[in-house]
Amino acid sequence: MTDLTIKIGGNYVWIDAAVVDSANNKTPLDLVGADPATCEIDVTSGKFARLVISASGDQGSQVTADVLRGEKSVCLKRFYKINADGHLDRAVTFDPDA
């Protein structure tokens, strides 16, 4: 198992996110706290995992996503903008053991 810390921030009205690990286990993120909202999870070690984000807000608003192994080792860092229709749907693959 690999311990991950997920941080999602930005200017959004609503957000939903999950991590799917290499064993196809889906872990919905219970994001808590202020910007950035944070969640700690365990995933099966393996070649990949996917972070899946759905959000809504004002067009052009930025959403940030950071995945850390432990508290400091960065596995993933992404910046997205909410689309013209007010929605954002993204899935990105990363190595949880990196």
Feature annotation, model-predicted:
Residues M1-V20, I41-A98:
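Beta-strand-rich recognition domains
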Residues N24-N25:
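Short, glycine-anchored, charge-dense loop/turn motifs used at functional sites
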Residues P28-A34:
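Short beta-strand segments within Ig-like beta-sandwich modules, predominantly Fibronectin type-III
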Residues P36-E40:
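Short, surface-exposed beta-strand/beta-hairpin micro-motifs centered on an aromatic residue
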